[in-house]
């Protein structure tokens, strides 16, 4: 199946590997010398019990080991790529309502998205998406599989939603913490997470659990049932599962400096940022503050400029003097003395919108799964699987729709109190600038994403004789479709809002909208002067019942064929081969509403979205947020691979060693041909229990549908070009000329696996080094212009800045292969297991620790005027210096207790900050100065236990975050919740109890 070039590549790699690599086998808890020990070790390697990063997934059949980090199945094979195994027992101990939460706690998992992330965004598209990210490289660079097969994406970036997977039938999860593109194809730069189901499950099992936080919110419940039965003398096997889960989330508390339901830790954190020009005084530019007050608006309205600046409005529009923090005094020019734009400290915080975001989304899971397998002969099975998964979520990104001093109110507005109208006349002004949190709105913005997956697989697997050996094969075809609907309620239309607040009194004494065209189209005036009720008619006009909508259909079609076996025996053992080919097609179509997308043949005006002269019907972008646009695209992939395992040493003195090689050739319909490869080895040394392993690989990620075919969005903008200010059309589109990202992964590890002098002890350390080039990233219009001026001809082709007709000047803003990343660090694990009967005590005791150390996470944007940015230890991001998971477990046949510790090291707000209090250097854009650059870490304790109340019934409990540790403040330049849910526990103490029934 491979070309001559491929074979030559393999041979060259084999020779090089034999000369220069000493490699490793297995992992944290390796294949045990005894089957019982192996099973016990695997069962102990859980997230809850700090699973071993080196633990290799294994399924033993006739001494053949299958591991997810490789396509090879062979006697005695130990792969060089570190792999963590979580068994079903391990996952059950975590007692999580969603397996995603258990896996995301692994230290190597960094940057995963769940229901506590992106709750402040309307348009990101990842809300409620449970996607896994290895090494902080993002979910798009982590390949998530179900039974070794790809799953249709739940987002236009192609990432899957683990919440749509069947979970009760999962017998193990394999986490491959190294590049695996040569074995599995695109996206496996960070590694692979493979969910393996129990295809031969017999019996029935049922799980029910419920819980809530210590604040009596985020109440959750889970119901799961699974069955399996063999028929026709065990030739026909049917398994299935149904699951329902609901996590009710944590509602928005609304406005003000208040946390939801008694959480007292929220203190309006923010950056107070002085102008660069002011930093010549030796003081820092940035200061982290609490009780930040946004002085450009108030809860019910604030005059922000002119002689009346500082006048706020309360109940029934009554004016009063606004209480600025920092003893601030308005200057009449928009500034406030004693404050640094846009924040004061303290004062009237009732209009703060930062705490108005949901801490956790309301999420509902409904999943159904079945597999029917039939043995057409003792060596051949055909099968069919069907998977239905529906995930619904709901959240509020922020209360109201704050307007930061960007409104103009006419002094003739009939809603103004007479005293303010008189003050306007006395000060000879006809209008003033105004800001409001819009707390009068009857509803917060509400976003309702729904993802529904339908997936079917038809396949066959079996064994056949070849070259005097037994070989195995598997083949399948798959179709997966994901429908995503995002419905937004209570969202305002900007143009209608502006028309409605610009009110006049007509000759008949009635109040109406000033804009006659808007008035003719149904404009209803809106009073935003003070705390006054909003009429249903006014609310229906500015925030119509049919808000922003996005409908997406993604489809994935796959055909795959793989064979593997032992080609022949060498003096050191069997030479194993795996080879195969795959064809895949990915496509999507997304459509928005006519107010967001613009009115076009595929999004016409309808009765739900009638024509309105006030709105921009061509470009769209009429909503306050949630302007979804139409797009579509497709690509296909053809690829073939070859993988070899070559034993090179078998000696009673020197031990055993093997070399693992893989090569994959892939052709994308969009970006052409690309090659990925892997060269690794493992050496079980002659030293008792000591193993070494190493692997180097070239891994790839092809551009996804969103990057290639992003919806076109056009807005007006200005750029600086050749000393002139140029007005442009900024056209944001996809880029079909993108190339695959290329990564080089290098791993070297040492494993001590239960030596005879310490049979219960295992430890490992693995060093990793990842270099990613041609990383796909987006630029601003100005950055593209600067790169063109610097001589980048590819980017020059994306703009026209010297057009004789100046209105035809444009810059196409799109993604390019410009950025690069270099990450390095190491994984540590140690575990000790002992039987307490040696101490005349009941049960077994296990201690484990798993830690990831990020030495560097350096990102280079590849943009003029920037420098590489160090992300390791940036605790506002995803990659802390240290992330750890430790556990201590006591197990008997009737009871178990597990104490777990989760640890995030302290870090910095940014590694580019220069920390100083006095005598600071002049701040720069690249290296700003800051008063305090320390961000605290966190340490959490969890406790869980089980009680076997009957032969088939087990009760369990779990307490997460026993100490109810508050989240660490994560300041931003704008008011937000000021937390980082990607690293920290933001929910608080959680209690869960449940019952499992098996027969």
Where are the model-predicted features located?
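N-terminal periplasmic accessory domains that precede
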Residues: 99-102, 130-133, 161-166, 187-208, ...
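Short loop/turn motifs that connect adjacent beta-strands in outer-membrane beta-barrel proteins
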Residues: 200-203, 232-235, 376-379, 463-473, ...
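N-terminal Sec signal peptide and the immediately downstream disordered periplasmic leader
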Residues: 2-107, 135, 224, 228, ...
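C-terminal beta-signal and terminal closure region of outer-membrane beta-barrel proteins
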Residues: 131, 611-612, 697, 714, ...
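Surface-exposed, low-complexity loop segments enriched in small/polar and acidic residues
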Residues: 156, 257-263, 318-365, 369, ...
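Extracytoplasmic beta-strand/coil segments of soluble accessory domains associated
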Residues: 104-149
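Short acidic/polar hinge/loop motifs at secondary-structure boundaries
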Residues: 149-177
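C-terminal beta-signal and adjacent terminal beta-strands/loops
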Residues: 4, 495, 771-773, 902-918, ...
């Amino acid at each position: 199946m491979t070309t001559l070039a491929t074979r030559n590549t393999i041979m060259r790699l084999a020779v090089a590997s034999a000369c220069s690599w000493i490699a490793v086998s297995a992992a944290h808890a390796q294949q045990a010398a005894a089957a019982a020990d192996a099973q016990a070790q695997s069962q102990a390697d859980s997230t809850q019990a700090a699973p071993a990063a080196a633990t290799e997934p294994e399924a033993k059949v006739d001494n053949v080991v299958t591991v997810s980090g490789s396509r090879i199945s062979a006697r005695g094979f130990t792969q060089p790529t570190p792999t963590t195994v979580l068994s079903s027992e391990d996952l059950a101990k975590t007692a999580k309502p969603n397996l995603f939460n258990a896996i995301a706690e692994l230290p190597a998992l960094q940057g995963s998205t769940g229901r506590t992330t992106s709750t402040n965004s309307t348009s990101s598209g990842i809300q409620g998406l449970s996607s896994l990210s290895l090494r902080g490289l993002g979910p798009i660079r982590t390949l998530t599989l179900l039974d070794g097969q790809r799953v249709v994406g739940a987002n236009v970036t192609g990432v899957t939603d683990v919440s749509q997977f069947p979970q009760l039938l999962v017998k193990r999860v394999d986490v491959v913490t190294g590049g695996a593109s040569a074995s599995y194809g695109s996206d496996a730069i960070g590694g692979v997470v493979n969910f393996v189901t129990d295809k031969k499950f017999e019996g029935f099992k049922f799980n029910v659990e419920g819980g809530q936080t210590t604040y009596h919110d985020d109440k959750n419940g889970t119901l799961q049932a699974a069955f399996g039965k063999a028929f026709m003398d065990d030739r026909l096997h049917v398994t299935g599962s149904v699951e329902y889960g609901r996590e009710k989330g944590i509602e928005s508390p609304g406005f003000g400096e208040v946390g939801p339901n008694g959480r007292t830790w929220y203190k309006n954190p923010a950056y107070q940022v002085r102008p660069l020009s002011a930093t010549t005084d030796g003081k820092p530019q940035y200061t982290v503050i609490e009780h930040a007050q946004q002085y450009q608006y108030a809860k019910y309205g604030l005059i922000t400029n002119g002689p009346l600046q500082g006048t706020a409005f309360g109940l029934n529009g009554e004016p009063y003097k606004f209480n600025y923090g920092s003893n601030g005094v308005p200057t009449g020019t928009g500034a406030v003395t004693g404050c640094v734009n846009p924040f004061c400290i303290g004062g009237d915080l009732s209009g703060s919108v930062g705490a108005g975001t949901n801490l956790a989304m309301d999420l509902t899971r409904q999943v159904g799964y079945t597999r029917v397998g039939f043995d057409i002969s003792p060596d051949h099975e055909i099968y069919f699987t069907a998977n239905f998964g529906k995930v619904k979520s709901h959240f509020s990104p922020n209360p109201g729709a704050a307007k930061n001093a960007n409104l103009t109110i006419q002094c003739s507005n009939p809603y103004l109190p007479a005293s303010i109208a008189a003050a306007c006349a006395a000060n000879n002004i006809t209008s003033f600038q105004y800001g409001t949190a819009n707390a009068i709105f009857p509803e917060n913005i509400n976003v309702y994403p729904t993802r529904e997956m339908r997936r079917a697989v038809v396949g066959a697997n079996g064994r056949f004789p070849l070259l005097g050996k037994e070989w195995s094969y598997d083949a399948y075809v798959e179709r997966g479709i994901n429908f995503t609907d995002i419905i937004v309620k209570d969202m305002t239309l900007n143009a209608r809002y502006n028309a409605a607040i610009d009110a006049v009194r007509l000759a008949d004494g009635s109040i109406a909208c000033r804009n006659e065209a808007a008035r003719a189209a149904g404009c209803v005036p809106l009073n935003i002067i003070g705390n006054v009720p909003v009429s249903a008619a006014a609310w229906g006009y500015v925030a119509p019942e049919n808000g922003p909508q996005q409908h997406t259909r993604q489809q994935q079609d796959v055909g795959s064929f793989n064979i593997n076996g032992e080609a022949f025996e060498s003096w050191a053992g069997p030479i194993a081969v795996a080879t195969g080919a795959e064809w895949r097609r990915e496509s999507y179509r997304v459509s928005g509403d006519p107010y967001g997308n613009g009115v076009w043949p595929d999004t016409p005006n309808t009765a739900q979205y009638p024509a309105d002269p006030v709105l921009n019907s061509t470009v769209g972008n009429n909503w306050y947020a949630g302007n979804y646009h139409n797009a579509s695209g497709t690509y296909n992939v053809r690829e073939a691979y070859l993988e070899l395992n070559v034993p090179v040493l078998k000696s009673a003195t020197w031990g055993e060693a093997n070399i693992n090689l893989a090569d994959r050739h892939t052709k994308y319909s969009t970006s052409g041909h690309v090659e990925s490869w892997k060269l690794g080895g493992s050496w079980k040394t002659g030293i008792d229990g000591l193993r070494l392993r190493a692997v180097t690989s070239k891994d790839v990620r092809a551009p996804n549908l969103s990057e290639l075919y992003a919806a076109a969005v056009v807005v007006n903008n200005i750029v600086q070009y050749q000393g002139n200010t140029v007005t442009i059309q900024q056209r944001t589109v996809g880029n079909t000329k993108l190339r695959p990202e290329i990564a080089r992964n290098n791993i070297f590890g040492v494993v001590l696996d239960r030596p005879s002098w310490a049979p219960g002890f295992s430890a490992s350390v693995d060093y990793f080094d990842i270099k990613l080039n041609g990383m796909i990233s987006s630029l601003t219009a100005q950055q593209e212009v600067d790169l063109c001026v610097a001589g980048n001809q590819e980017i020059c082709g994306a703009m026209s800045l010297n057009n004789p007709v100046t209105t035809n000047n444009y810059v196409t803003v799109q993604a390019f292969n410009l950025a690069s990343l270099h990450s390095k660090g190491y994984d540590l694990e140690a575990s000790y297991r002992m039987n307490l009967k040696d101490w005349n005590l009941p049960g077994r005791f296990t201690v484990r620790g798993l830690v990831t150390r990020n030495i560097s996470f350096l990102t280079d944007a590849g943009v003029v005027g920037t420098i590489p940015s160090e992300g390791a230890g940036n605790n506002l991001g995803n990659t802390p210096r240290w992330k750890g998971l430790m556990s201590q477990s006591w197990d008997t046949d009737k009871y178990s207790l597990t104490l777990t510790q989760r640890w995030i090291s302290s870090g910095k707000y940014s590694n580019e900050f220069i920390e100083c209090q006095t005598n600071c250097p002049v701040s720069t854009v690249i290296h700003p100065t800051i008063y305090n650059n320390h961000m605290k870490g966190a340490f959490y304790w969890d406790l869980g236990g089980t009680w076997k109340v009957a032969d088939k019934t087990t009760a369990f409990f779990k307490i997460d975050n026993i100490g109810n540790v508050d989240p660490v403040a994560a300041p931003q330049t704008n008011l937000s919740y000021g937390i980082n849910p990607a690293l920290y526990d933001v929910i608080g103490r959680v209690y869960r109890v449940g019952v499992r029934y098996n027969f």
